[in-house]
Amino acid sequence: SAAYVGMAVFITGGKGAGQYGYVNTYNAGTKVATIKKYSDNSDGWEQIVSGRAIEAALDNTTVYSVEPRVVVQAPGNDGSTATSTALCRAKVADGKISEVRIIHPGSSYTTAPTVTFTDPNNTADAPLETFIGDGVLAQPAFTSRGTGWTTLSATIEDVGQEKDITGVTFTANPYAEILLTAN
């Protein structure tokens, strides 16, 4: 199933807070998803907070959010080279992207980058314009908010050697397996 493939997963509270990645594969029958890093598409989580260790085993304090993934790509074929690409989160309200929160603005942009949203469930895209200022990405301006965007959240229950986050399972493997269920 492609229900959540490409969507962002942010751990927003408790153990592992600040970790993020995106859904690479999702099995609707088992509700198992694999997580990849934004930076290099390898298996596992990244951490928003510089220097904070990645938590391999989460517990019943962990809270996460699945939301449209925002990808900011450096412009191509124009001589510009972003030395660091931006990291953003899409805020969804009433099924529409209401804002894009810039967590890290990136650096060394000489022209505005391309921004894409990934949510296999959306029914209308959310086109926007990007701007740069002093070589960093500025807040975008929407021309339409789109419709049908999805978010969900989960709670965690402790289950022996594994941690079950209302269907989210983390194992000793170097990547996370997440079981997703919509609210």
Where are the language model's segments positioned?
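Short, solvent-exposed secondary-structure boundary/capping segments
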Residues: 27-43, 98-101, 178-180
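Short beta-strand-centered aromatic/proline hotspots
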Residues: 18-26
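Conserved, function-critical positions that sit in or immediately flank catalytic
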Residues: 2-14, 24, 53-183
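Short solvent-exposed strand/turn elements
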Residues: 34-61
